[in-house]
């Protein structure tokens, strides 16, 4: 999944931010990875009622997963979105995922976003296919770039289908990776904790 790919660097980090958090997926999955929480740990499955799988097997595996978790990890996750309903949903999702005490979501505009030094920014900014307005998506990417350049020591991973993202953002990515968001071809634009070359006009 795109979320898991983008969160793969989190084990090194203690602070993750997302200025376009939506329902909180990126920050929540980053928290689960940092804490080494097994997928589905808090869920129940129909297969648990199968006669040919002893209940003790499920209990043993669930206990192993709990023992492997790193609940002492110093992780903090912060998400921001201009939509109050999305923020409310993100906070609810974090609680359901068992990371409500590690993730906080607030209503805020991207222009007011303040990247923290030494953090990693994971984000899936709105783009044409999702937003319905390519010009507005470009403006959001431009604002994100301006905000990020105020604190370029923060690493940033942006998932988008915008082929001109680098030009709108104002910086050439250190690395890119092609992925799919459902049926939409996208790329992860990676900006590491070091200066990167500006895009040539």
Residue ranges and their predicted role:
Residues 13-20:
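Conserved class I S-adenosyl-L-methionine
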Residues 14, 74, 195:
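Positively charged, low-complexity nucleic-acid-binding target-recognition regions
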Residues 157-201:
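Class I S-adenosyl-L-methionine
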Residues 34, 40-172:
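S-adenosylmethionine
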Residues 20-24, 182-183:
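A short acidic Gly-Thr/Ser loop motif
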Residues 24-28, 35:
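Glycine-rich SAM-binding Motif I of class I
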Residues 14, 25, 120:
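Hydrophobic "anchor" residues on beta-strands that sit immediately upstream
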């Amino acid at each position: 999944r795109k979320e898991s790919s983008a969160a793969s660097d989190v084990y090194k980090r203690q602070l993750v931010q997302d200025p376009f958090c939506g329902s909180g997926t990126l920050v929540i999955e980053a928290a689960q990875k940092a804490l080494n929480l097994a997928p589905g740990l808090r869920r129940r499955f129909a297969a648990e009622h199968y006669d040919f799988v002893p209940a003790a097997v499920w209990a043993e595996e669930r206990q192993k997963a709990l023992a492997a978790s790193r609940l002492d990890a110093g992780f903090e996750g912060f998400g921001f979105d201009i939509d109050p309903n999305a923020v409310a949903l993100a906070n609810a999702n974090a609680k359901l995922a068992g990371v409500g005490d590690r993730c906080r979501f607030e209503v805020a505009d991207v222009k007011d976003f303040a990247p923290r030094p030494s953090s990693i920014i994971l984000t899936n900014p709105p783009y044409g296919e999702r937003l319905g307005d390519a010009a507005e998506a470009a403006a959001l990417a431009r604002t994100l770039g301006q905000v990020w350049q105020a604190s370029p020591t923060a690493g940033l991973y942006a998932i988008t289908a915008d082929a001109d993202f680098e030009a709108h953002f104002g910086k050439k990515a250190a690395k890119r990776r092609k992925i799919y968001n459902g049926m939409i071809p996208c790329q992860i634009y990676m900006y590491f904790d070091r200066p990167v070359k500006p895009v040539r006009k």
